[in-house]
A protein has these predicted regions:
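Proteins enriched for Cys/Gly/acidic motifs involved in redox and nucleic-acid/cofactor modification
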Residues: 1-174
Length: 174
């Protein structure tokens, strides 16, 4: 069993939904309840934009490190925006984490779990929202480098998804 922990914005929710479908397709059972984690593997998808969200992500990682040290968790993986931006620092400061992945490393995580031959991220998602709405990502990144914003540092240049892919995802949801 695997615990998937979502930190931060709704953008992360879409990423978690992609992970869930891949885990299901590869035979993993999962849970999203960070208040009652029960899995032997934990994947924490972090936020790295706002100071409070960064701290919450770090606190959550440390809580799961404690579970691992107590023998209640076998493997701990961290991914998402925080680890994309601060991977080297996190690896140095929290060596108990088995592996830090960036924001775009879904296939590498599956490979680490022994499922390298698993499906690709084709946009098919396991929806965790109520049936009447879903988040649809239309782009990633930003080309502006505002002094107060870390989006371009973390996610790179603005890249739009192909229009046909977006429309197909919306059709699949209706």
């Amino acid at each position: 069993t695997m615990d998937l922990i979502k930190m931060g914005c709704s953008n992360i929710l879409g990423e978690i939904e992609l992970l869930i479908i891949q885990f299901e397709d590869n035979g993993y059972h999962w849970g999203l309840d960070s208040q009652r984690p029960q899995g032997e593997i934990a994947v924490i998808n972090t936020c790295g934009f706002i100071e409070d969200a960064k701290q919450e992500s770090i606190d959550t990682i440390l809580e799961f490190v404690q579970r691992k040290q107590e023998g209640r968790l076998k493997k701990l993986y961290v991914m998402g925006c925080l680890s994309q931006r601060y991977q080297k620092e996190l690896e140095k400061e929290i060596p108990e984490v088995d592996k830090f992945y960036g924001k775009f490393n879904y296939k590498q995580l599956l490979g680490e779990l022994g499922k390298a031959d698993g499906p690709s991220c084709d946009g098919h998602r396991h929806l965790t929202t109520p049936r009447h709405y879903a988040y649809v990502k239309i782009a990633e990144g930003c080309d502006r480098h505002c002094a107060y914003c870390a989006i371009p540092i973390i996610t790179g240049k603005h890249v739009s998804r192909p229009k046909a892919e977006i429309l197909q995802e919306v059709r699949d949801r209706v």
